């Protein structure tokens, strides 16, 4: 069995895929980026953000030092991009991004292996800082406290999963060594972590209404390109290429957590669904994408080890973990229904699907993925 160590993929056993704490501003040379990213909500609200971006100097991204600075720069630049594109709402979107943003964003994206668009890795994994066991949001999108709460809850869900790092490692190490007790312990702890993820996700209801999310937050997470997109022809990155680029928008579908659990528990999907999930991986940090590939390609997968042991305690722990994951996915469907489907009264199903999953039917897709999860019970 392949030796998979979380640290190899820049995954912490304490905070998972969240980026280790870093400074929330770049060095003084990049102060124009710091200032615009921090003041985005106020400047968008006053309809002055685009003008401020146009006055921004073209800075040299090669002066960034190290991986974390580059991740922070990517966060700032995609936030600036989002504010610039969507300041006037979906009906007032522009189709060209000024060179002062597009060129450094393109180059930083190439350095990191990330897409030059707002992704979950930016708005959550980089933007949510773990502080005293809680989540602190460094940069906000327009919408005030409701928007900040949405971002914080996304971070809390990731943190709940992140605390299962040792449990996941125990399952993998136990499977490699045929250590039934270690695997069972890992599954038990992972089951608790999935329950904590659901508890964290349920907190969305405390300070975020469906109307605020759909009309206030979601537009700033939009991608571009395609018949249902407000920027149907794609976005031109000035100073990079005159050819418009198509990108999907940022969403929790780009979180690696669900696909890690799929890989660990041996959950498989139809070729069509898997093709979409594979495409989503291209919007994740490369090390996280590699971890998913390695989990998928393990020659002797975890469920096979569980089945071969014929150990009642291990099988019970495995099935309990699968059941918790099914329950989480069922609850996630309820959240999506409340905050996206029900709130999208003016959007066609096709438009809704484009904006949120790229699938032709959002809820049926999520239900099928949940049903695929249930099938791996032993």
UniProtKB/Swiss-Prot annotation:
PROSITE patterns, alphabetized: IDO_1, IDO_2
GO cellular component: cytoplasm
One example GO MF annotation: heme binding
Cofactor note as given: Binds 1 heme group per subunit.
Keywords: Heme, Iron, Metal-binding, Oxygen transport, Transport
Keyword Magnesium appears in the UniProt entry: no
Any one biological process term the GO annotation gives: 'de novo' NAD biosynthetic process from L-tryptophan
Cofactor(s) required, per the database record: heme
Residues where heme binds: 332
Gene3D superfamilies in alphabetical order: 1.20.58.480
Taxonomy, superkingdom: Eukaryota
Matches recorded under InterPro entries: Indolamine_dOase, Trp/Indoleamine_2_3_dOase-like
Family that this chain belongs to: Belongs to the indoleamine 2,3-dioxygenase family.
Role summary: Serves a reserve supply of oxygen and facilitates the movement of oxygen within muscles.
Subunit annotation: Homodimer.
Protein name in the entry: Myoglobin
Species per Swiss-Prot/TrEMBL record: Haliotis madaka (Giant abalone)
């Amino acid at each position: 069995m392949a030796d998979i160590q979380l640290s190899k993929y820049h995954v912490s056993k304490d905070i998972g895929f969240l980026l280790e704490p870093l400074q929330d501003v770049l060095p003084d040379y990049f102060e124009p980026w710091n200032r615009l990213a921090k003041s985005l909500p106020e400047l968008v609200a006053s309809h002055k953000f685009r003008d401020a971006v146009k006055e921004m100097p073209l800075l040299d991204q090669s002066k960034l030092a190290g991986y974390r600075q580059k991740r922070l720069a990517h966060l700032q630049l995609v936030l600036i991009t989002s504010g610039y594109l969507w300041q006037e709402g979906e009906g007032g979107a522009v189709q060209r991004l000024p060179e002062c943003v597009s060129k450094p964003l393109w180059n930083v994206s190439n350095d990191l292996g990330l897409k030059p668009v707002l992704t979950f890795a930016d708005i959550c994994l980089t933007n949510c800082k773990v502080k005293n066991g809680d989540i602190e949001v460094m940069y906000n999108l327009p919408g005030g406290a409701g928007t900040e709460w949405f971002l914080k809850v996304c971070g809390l869900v990731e943190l709940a999963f992140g605390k299962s790092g040792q449990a996941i490692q125990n399952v993998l190490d136990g499977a490699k060594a045929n250590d039934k007790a270690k695997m069972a312990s890992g599954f038990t702890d992972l089951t608790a972590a999935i329950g904590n993820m659901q508890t964290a996700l349920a907190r969305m209801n405390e300070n975020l209404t469906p109307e605020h999310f759909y009309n206030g937050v979601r537009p700033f997470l939009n991608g571009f390109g395609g018949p249902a997109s407000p920027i149907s022809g794609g976005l031109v990155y000035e100073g990079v290429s005159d050819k418009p680029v198509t990108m999907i928008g940022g969403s929790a579908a780009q979180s690696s957590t669900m696909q890690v659990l799929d890989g660990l528990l041996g959950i498989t999907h139809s070729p069509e669904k898997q093709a979409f999930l594979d495409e989503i991986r291209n919007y994740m940090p490369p090390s996280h994408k590699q971890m998913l590939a390695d989990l998928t390609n393990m020659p002797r997968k975890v469920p096979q080890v569980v089945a071969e042991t014929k150990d009642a305690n291990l099988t019970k722990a495995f099935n309990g973990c699968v059941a918790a994951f099914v329950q989480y996915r069922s609850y996630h469907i309820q959240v999506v229904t409340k905050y996206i489907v029900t709130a999208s009264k003016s959007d066609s199903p096709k438009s809704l699907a484009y904006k949120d999953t790229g699938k032709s039917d959002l809820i049926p897709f999520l239900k099928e993925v949940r049903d695929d999860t249930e099938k791996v019970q032993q």
